[in-house]
A protein has these predicted regions:
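Hydrophobic alpha-helical segments typical of transmembrane helices
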Residues: 24, 36, 59, 139, ...
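Catalytic core of membrane glycerolipid acyltransferases/transacylases, capturing the structured
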Residues: 88, 122-182, 208-215, 244, ...
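Membrane-anchoring hydrophobic helices of lipid-metabolizing enzymes
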Residues: 2-130, 172
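Short, flexible loop segments at the rims of nucleotide/cofactor-binding pockets, characterized by
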Residues: 103-108, 155, 174-180, 216-217, ...
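Non-catalytic C-terminal accessory region of glycerolipid acyltransferases
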Residues: 2-6, 10-13, 32, 51, ...
Length: 309
């Protein structure tokens, strides 16, 4: 009983420290001039490296999935760049609520927006399927500024306070947040039936009940949601990648053409086909800038075996 109490107390203190750190970085990056934000980034990167030090082998494995030739110094440099990119994600996301439409428009280059417009013209909604790549939050803010309703399904965190902080952050710039729980499916379909946009981070199977695919040469599972909702509602399924570009707040977004969701067999077979086609698109997007792929958790069966060993 005492051990459980001590563990809970320690976890609560850790959560409080993390939340405090996030809030400090959030407030500082909002008021500092662009030249000073680089200093904050330099401070934040080592902190993230400490908190996520156990994830370095996983990040290295992911870098080698994309670029098997990476070894030694080049691999270590790729891993370090991934941590730097992750720090930049948080810093530039925290800056979003205080930036104007003019600021956002000037800082992001979007290719393939016509795929979203054409899909919305069909009246069945749009599913934007994303890997954890670059500064994806910026694409959401930009879409909202174009006059579109954006819904995002988000993972519930172990810390309710931390989860609320990020929900409030996204709501502050117009995102309708759908928590990933037993009500999420209904909320997603309602949004699509209203011809809205739903964003789904789709390269990690959080619930462990996804669809088996081949992803960078190894079998694993990915979320069933994108394929299921697209086939169920007829909503267009569009892969999207957002990348950091050179310079503070500079981003590039690429919207790929819609994945084919035409029914050809059973629902199960069609879901498998659509999920695999989507992952092939993710591989294209990730290969463009693999060091910006923020996947710091085991995602393949071999990751879990390596972690145990």
């Amino acid at each position: 009983m005492t051990n459980n109490s001590e563990t809970q107390t320690k976890a609560s203190r850790t959560d409080a420290l993390i939340i405090f750190g996030y809030r400090v970085v959030s407030r500082v990056t909002k008021i500092l001039p662009p030249t000073a934000v680089a200093v904050v980034t330099a401070i934040v990167v080592p902190i993230i490296c400490v908190f996520l030090r156990k994830q370095r082998p996983i990040v290295a494995r992911n870098m080698r999935r994309v670029s098997p030739e990476l070894r030694g110094f080049k691999l270590r440099r790729a891993v370090s760049k991934s941590y730097q990119s992750y720090a930049r994600y948080y810093i530039e996301t925290f800056r979003l609520p205080n930036l104007t439409k003019k600021n956002i428009d000037a800082k992001i280059l979007v290719s393939g927006f016509e795929h979203i417009e054409n899909a919305l013209n069909l009246g069945k909604g749009v599913i934007l399927a994303l890997p954890h790549l670059g500064g994806w939050e910026w694409s959401g803010r930009w879409l909202i500024h174009q006059g579109h309703n954006l819904n995002a399904v988000v993972e519930k965190l172990d810390s309710p306070a931390l989860f609320k902080m990020f929900v409030d952050l996204r709501k502050s710039y117009g995102v309708n947040v759908i928590p990933l729980d037993d009500k999420a499916g209904v909320a997603v379909q309602e949004a699509l039936y209203k011809n809205e946009i739903v964003a789904l981070l789709s390269d990690r199977d959080l619930q462990g009940n996804g669809i088996e695919v081949e992803f960078f040469g190894e079998r694993t599972t990915v979320p069933a949601g994108p394929a299921f909702f697209a086939l169920r509602t007829g909503a267009a399924l569009l892969p999207l990648g957002t990348y950091f570009a050179k310079g503070l707040d500079q981003h590039e977004t690429i919207v790929r053409p819609a994945v084919d969701i035409q029914r050809t067999g059973s629902l199960r077979d069609d879901m498998s086909r659509v999920a695999q086609d989507l992952i092939r698109e993710f591989e294209i997007l990730i290969r463009k800038k693999p060091e910006q792929w923020h996947l710091f958790q085991p995602n393949w069966p071999s990751d879990k075996i390596a972690d145990v060993n």
